[in-house]
């Protein structure tokens, strides 16, 4: 246990500040979404975002860096809530060296931080090393002073880090003894035991060898350090609590869950598990959503959906029958916003995403509840004491109803579920799916395999809005289904469709699939490698069954808006070629309803005059009303006609070519208008750089231009009314106001300078002499940080012997500035060190350069004492 029970937020700052004092650059946490790393779904360690630095692909901003990295791991999801060690979301503290310091410094600083900064008892800390790493043993034993019998040697499996060929090396871990009550009671229980007594809190990886892939190791020229320490695990040790769920910031989230659910720790093991699952999963979900992940049926979106639905399901087990996770979001944000201010900025968005997902899941559950009640009534009518496995399987398979909820609800009615029969049916379904895959069917998009017996989907939607087809496959929850009911989200594959799948930058159509007994609402369409169109959506009424005939109908308004934007995209490319030159190649595009984004190669920013001309040319082509002609031609013939292809794209033997009058001829598989006149109004929204040599234009068409125009007109009228003028004279009024504000600001700055000059004279006159230096502390209300800095700079520049701390309070916020004249700095007084002490004394933090440093505090009641300590600081630190 530490000498003081530091909070999670304190420990994070202590770690980062400590390594800053050791010359490390503090980097903010990287996003949970990996950047340019296809090997990871989500960032799962502090080292993961550092890979480009370790591999030499990117030059690090400094050879020493430290981070507190957000991480997600879902491999142990079934253990969440049952153990003290497992959590989906955690923060990983890490210090890294890229060819700078090595074992001596890494081990020494590790020990210093744990014992001197955190105050953990030395006799409860045990280092482990790789069995052959005598160098690490000598450092721990001789330099740190750990007795040999307290240093544990382990083999490659535990204490040697490598991943195939490439850089690798031994590691040294530090374990914390939590005490006998957490042990397994076995006589041989010691470091390395699987029980909860000895908890690994820090791992130092010494990357010093290169593995050639054949078991041969050579020394690396540049040796690196990669360390990791779980912030929550450190807090468990420092706060002397039972588990990750008992540390302060996490427990505060649990308190909110308790307040909503009425369940308390200790009521039962099952309720304790549910409270922990909800706490862990909503914590992870908030950070994932903030970093840009949205619930979906694939990839990291599926991870998020599973976490939210699992948490909602445990809410059901605690008796909550309404969306409640959205009410916990605020507490998660409150506990973490100090270090992650982006959470507060996105609070409304995060809450909305969580609420919508809860509501969608509730609809699934509600539909299953009704069917469960009908099944239950039938069982009771037959005087049965066991709820059949077949019914439980149907609830799960057709309605997406979780089996553990079925078990819970059946028990409430005095019945047990035949789980053996349920598992048998589940196994049979898996066997059927496995046998279907043996047909060597093509690998579907998102890993979905439909088999060779299902033909390619025939797209018939270029010239019609509706058609009739047959349901060939249904997939829900990653498994094939024969039937889906209302509320179930699924993928439906048809033999033919009018709905365009997302391709070539054009978004998918939306619409409906209507069967004899139900309606499936389509919100996305994707085409897999085998040519199947996968219709993503949800059953909104009745049921949809495999093999039944159905009517497919697109949303005609959405299709028309997409056509307007896509046709305008072709006209825009033609205008770019004419205005900017033939070097302009398409580098990417996005076509949405009445909105387009077009990336193109160009060596410089498009000038305002060029942009106006491009917009005018598109509008001219629209007004001309050129007919749209579509042809399917051999690729050689299309190229002979001069059709524009997407640079670097591979095409088949035949291609679809879209011609618009004499202005545009392009390879294209998208949907278009039959005449350019139907594009309607066209307006360029913006032009910007997206990469070196690549520019991007965004534009609106049709109804969106009308909506934007109306909105802008209304805004102009409102602004003119507010400024008591007319829209026509608005610019003149704005110029006058800008000039007036500029003049007033100059006068205000002059008055401030005069006031500051007088204030500084008074401050310097009242300065205290300490060791030959002039020490002064000044406290004022409502001075802006910039003004405080100006005042400090003048004091420092006018008096070389000055040591000053200036404080400004605005509400409960304290802004602090320390400045030191050149003589004071020369005598060992550093503003950065001074501001750290003063800030910490009033509940905050700070830092900076030797002659000027900024900080802040949160406890107004401690400000006077903090300022009173400046004289002692000067006396102590004088050289």
Kindly label every feature range from the protein language model.
Residues 1-879:
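A glycine- and charged-residue-rich anion-binding loop/surface
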